[in-house]
UniProtKB/Swiss-Prot annotation:
Compositional bias segments (type: Basic residues): 1-10, 796-821
Protein name from the UniProt record: ATP-dependent RNA helicase MAK5
Region (Disordered): 1-49, 89-160, 792-836
Residue numbers covered by motif Q motif: 222-250
Short motif (DEAD box): ranges: 389-392
Cellular location(s): Nucleus, Nucleolus
Segments of skewed composition (Basic and acidic residues): 822-836
Gene field: MAK5
Organism from which the protein derives: Scheffersomyces stipitis (strain ATCC 58785 / CBS 6054 / NBRC 10063 / NRRL Y-11545)
Reactions performed catalytically: ATP + H2O = ADP + phosphate + H(+)
BP term (GO), one: rRNA processing
InterPro entries recorded: DEAD/DEAH_box_helicase_dom, DEAD_box_RNA_helicase, Helicase_ATP-bd, Helicase_C-like, P-loop_NTPase, RNA-helicase_DEAD-box_CS, RNA_helicase_DEAD_Q_motif
Amino acid sequence: MAPNNKKIKGKSNVGKGSKSKKGQQTRKTPTLKQKLHRESKVVKAESLNWKTVEVPDNLDDWEGFYGLEEIDGVDVKIVNGKAEFIVKDNKKVKKGKTEEQEELEDDEEQDEDEESEADEEQGEDEDEDEEHEEDKINEENEDEFEEEEFTGFDDDSEIQDGMEVEDILDEDINEIGEVDESVEPVQESKPEHDEELSENVFQHSQFVLPDDEDINLPHWQNEDSNFSLSPYTLHGLSVLGFDKPTPIQKKTIPLAAEGKDVVGKAITGSGKTLAYGIPILEKYLSNLSIINQNRQKKIINHPTGIIFAPTRELAHQVVSHLNSLAKYSPLSTNGIVSITGGLSIQKQERLLSHGPGIIVATPGRILELLQKDEDLTKRLASTDIIVLDEADRLLQDGHFEEFETILDLFRKNRPKNKTFPWKWQTLVFSATFSRDLFGKLDKNQKSHKRNSEGSSLIGNDEILNLLNDKLKFKDTRPALVDANPKEIVSGNITEALVECGPTERDLYLYYFLLMYKGSTLVFANSIDSVKRLVPFLNNLNIPAFAIHSSMIQKQRLRALERFQKASEKNDTAVLIASDVAARGLDIPNIDHVAHYHLPRSADVYIHRSGRTARAGKEGVSVMFCSPQEASGPLRKLRRLVANNSTKGGRLNMHNDVKLLPIEMDLVSQLKPRVIIASKLADADISNTSTRKEDSWVKQAAEELGVDDLSDLDDFEDDIIKKQRKRKEGKMITKDEKKGLRYELKELLSKSIRKETRRSYLTSGLQNIAHQMVTGVGHEDVVGHSKVNALDDLKGKKVARSKAGKVTKPSQKKQEKKQKKQERKDTMRKQKEGNRK
């Protein structure tokens, strides 16, 4: 390289001979043409690094494509009828031609450009010559730097823990794009480093084994057995702040670690994810030496555990929770992957090709992958553990045929040798395991005798036999764990009822959201209701977001992210959801769950209500119920869900569920707002649906060759006509919409006042002036103190006097009611004893 460099310098010095001392002057920036010359190179076709095109085997003959070659990343320019190939990447050029020769050609072209410009501006040409000289020197230094840099990887190279060189290259390829296979990898220049690197994958691991003295988690050590968690897991639990295991975790983790099949039941929000996640992680760590040996032999490892979830959102949530725990273990970054619908199947195939340790999947997408790849089926069939999260869905007939097909494929393709046990370990978890909870609430079904243990899993042979028929447990009888045998709904959830008419749900929902600040999750039975409630609440200046099954996966995840951000910024944030968000989702800091419609079955109600009061916190579950629902479905729901303390006696619904206190003077002031907001929301939905129908009808008419659309009215069904007329009746013009929006804006600008007849701030029972000064007044209701739904329902509501002092209400009325109830119970028991 040195002789060529001297030639370049000599050439540049010639142009410098007649130059005066201008080195100290400011240099001008290079022209666009000079920049293009430096960035790109013109090469010949035979100098390019062509790739051979692989012709598919299904072609009988080559059809003129024999020896076809291709290349990408090269620009073609036609100059004087000839094609010139312009290259910006040196990898696209064969190594036969030296880089020094290419630089000389570029320098000659740049010198020619400079000579052509010298006649016009000689002074600028001298500056540019000086600039070219320094650029050439810089290019020489860069070439020398590149030669020193790309001599291979040193021993001190930092490799991401738990990953091979191939994994790192795969990630680089995905970030940069498609890489030419004919270009030799850079690290091949020093093969001895590659061999050493592949033999010592975890030699430079950042995961130093934590010191046992630094970890103080005595509650996680099981004194009854010799089982103990690894330091990696204990370190992760310590960092996450999980000092004590929950009851379900304390009972199931030792059993699962012994390799037993486990069926676990616990209330919502009790930590079931870690109850099965920790045993899988411990199993992976115990097999770490075998996993590393397989990596050195270029063998793809089979997964340690496969977790099946009923919904996509739950699968992504499980991955997030397990990653937060496994972050402090040797499990690689791609060691836990989610395989769900709605996302790129090619990316999921690539993730599975790396042999992840834990797979969290929905049955539909993973079945699609298994049917495409037989090798993948054999590898996944070798798994050690299979987990069913929210497994109560399997008890319902007609659900999850895909899951049963997956199990059949695993049984047929599981290796039959001494290396693998003949059957995998099965872990089953859910919050509901009673068949009575799955019946429709609006249908009259035969009354089943309630078990003496209520909803307890222990001794429930019917559920156990049903699970065994579908799952084929490894053990003759799996270990049954019921952390809450007497609880169906979590004791931290306060249930409430709002009695309203069928057409007044919007009004009372708005009242609830306005009065009680916080993040609220509203469930509706239909997707149309979800779509209507979002614009309705947005019109009332309440941030609302929607999630339902008709949305694609990215839209659902984006809606959840926006809701969480809105709940952090604003006092009130609402997520309107269908039952797709009812199971398993752990959305942080949900204060209230509102049932806009009464759920269709009791198990859905349990899982809906379980979205609040998670991880030991308290929450409120409110039902908006019409008189028609109260007479039938609500009574049946309360009979199934009520605490076991009321068994054997007559169910008093008002004692079981508390009525939410409603102030009718405030409701009457909110009604005009709700009417206008509802009209605007209905108009938006009607306009959108009618526009879609019209476009569909026009497209169908064009395909049928019908010119006059009125001819299609004769073939339209009567029901469709009624629906169309109903939608058209809700449509309004643009001027009417503007008028309604202006009217609603005026109403929202006016404050709601308690006891509106008062004219002075200091008059009445509430001292408004004192509330405004101290900041204890309600933000949206003048003359009303701040309220909390949990305190109001638990009887902690306080009365504030004119001076602002707090006084507790008397409890004599409550004590009288309790005494009367006790007398009635004793009289009833005496009568039953006399009859016997």
